[in-house]
Each structure stands twice: as structure tokens, then as C-alpha cells.
Amino acid sequence: MKKIIATITTLILVTSCSNRLVQHENNGFTYSEISIKEGGKWVDGKRGHKEYEGGTFRNVQEHTLDPQHTDHAFDIRYEGPGWENQNVGYRLYLDWRNAVDIFGKKVKTQVLQDVGQDGFDSYHDPQPWGQDILKAGKSLGIGGFGRLVNDTVAHLHQVENTYVKVKNSKNVSSFEIDYSKWKTADHTTDVKAKVSIYPYDRFSKFELKTFVLTNGLTNGLVKFKNIPLQQKKSANGSWGYIATYGKQTLVDKNDLLGMAIFYKSDEVEKLVNGKDDHLIVFKPTTKTMTYYILAAWAQEPNGLKNETEFYNDLNSKLVQLEKSNRL
């Protein structure tokens, strides 16, 4: 009888609705969501574009962007899909910026379902659970993608349609985004992106595919003054990373954060020192490309507390990637 009850309990947790976590045997969890406003209306905003006024947020499994949506339009809670495990949270700006931001967590429990419910951008201020800790600015944040055109990163200003679908399953939480007819300069392509998080560690997996050969497709890591870039390849050169560590958060002038992107060497054309980002430029292909992002906040409970611990962790992951081609 106890085994039957335990099995039923596990199934309930695994098949839970979109605003509940997926619990795992190791007591970790994963969760992803997107939350949109309903019951309000579009009005002329103070920033020169339409804003969504009134209504209440509701979690949905899938969503097609309203043509009037842009940054700070207030129709999507914390501006895009979010994903987390017990160590870290992330969010992606589902608009022209297409940047990835970081939620630093001070607790090991699920938090995203409540983030932004008490005020659209209250997560910029310190909360008991943590806060938004990264200032992305004009950059791609940590692992967002764009296209390098004449030494300038073109974000997703011109996209005909954007569709996102969220999935919470037994061993992973993820979301997929289909960008239809992304235009940069004289080039147009559809793009599919899949982002996944697991119940352990701090990394998140990105799978990216363009349907037309695209020169200059790039991801990036936001640059901060006086924070040096570190680069390293695995022993056989099959994988590499770019990373930064230091006082580079919104919290206070002494707060420490490590950020990294792991990439497959045979998928990458070059590394570029961009204006706002450290860039990883991919070779043109219509095959799916894979990379991983990782954020380690010094205030994370039982986390990586200093630069030495951070880079030791990255180097151990390079060994793992070389051995198994995955984290």
C-alpha cells in the first residue's frame, strides 16, 4: 500500500499543471513557465508604444506574441518565459532584445510563480527569495542570441511571429520558441530555440536552429568594465568556454557573480570582442547547435563562493563535456 501511495504521489507531482514544480527523486526540482495578462486592454503608453493596462496574470502552456508586444509592455509577467531549479533562475526577454537575465536565489524552493505578482518589476529589489541580479542593458545578457552584422549585433527587431511553448516533465523543464521570418539586413530565416534546465547544478542547455544558412549568428555574454574575460578549451579542444567573474551584479558594488557559456568548438567560427558583449559567432549551418550557460551567484545557499571555486567548477565541466559531449 505504501508503495502504491508513493507512486501516485510521484505521478501527481510529475504531471502537475504549469504553475507547479516538477519534483525529482534527489529532492531537486525544475520549473518553467510563461504568464500572460488577460482581461485588460492595450492603451497608448508613456514610452511611445502600446502598453497593456489592467487584467490579471495567468500561466499558460503556450503563447503567440501579440503584435503590439515589446519591451516594458506589461502584458507578460517578468517579460518572458522563466525557468529555475533549486540553485538558480533565468528569464528570457521575449521581445526584440532576446536577452537572458538571471534570478539570484537565496532559497532552495520554487519561487518563479510568485515573481512579479506584487508589482511588475518588484524583482529588481531585494526579496526574501533573492532578486534579478543582472543588468543586461543593450547586451544579449547571458547566452541570448542575435546576428553580427558589420560589427553590430542585430537583435530580433524584425520578426513576423513568435510562438512559445512550455513543458514541465519528469527529468527536465524546458520551453521552445519558434521565431518566424527573422529579418536582419537582407537576410531572413526562421529560428527554433529550445532551452532546458535540470534538477541539479546551475547550467541551462540551449539548442538553436536556423532554417537558412545564416552568417554571423552569435550568442553573447554581457561585458562589464574592469571584469576580465577568461577563455579555456578542453584537453582535446572539442569544447570551450568563455567566462567572467567579479563584481557585476545589480545588488551592490561588492556582490559577486560568475557567468559562463560553454560551446562546441566545431560549431564556432570565431570569438569576437563586441561593443556590449563577449561574442561566440557560429559557423553557418541548418543543423541544431548546442551550448550551455551557467550563472553562479555568491549569495546562493551552499553555492560557489569565490573565483577559485567558480573556475574549478567550470574546468570540471569541460572534462565532463569532453568525455560525454553533454552536461
Residue ranges and their predicted role:
Residues 164-171, 199, 211-216, 282-288:
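A short, structured loop/turn motif at beta-sheet edges
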Residues 15-16:
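C-terminal motif of bacterial Sec signal peptides marking the signal peptidase cleavage site
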Residues 1-4:
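Positively charged n-region of N-terminal signal peptides that target proteins for export
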Residues 191, 202-234:
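Acidic (Asp/Glu-rich), glycine- and aromatic
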Residues 125, 129-199:
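Extended, loop-rich substrate-binding clefts of extracytoplasmic carbohydrate-active enzymes
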Residues 21-155:
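Solvent-exposed N-terminal domain segments of exported/luminal and surface proteins
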Residues 70, 259-327:
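Beta-strand-rich recognition/accessory modules
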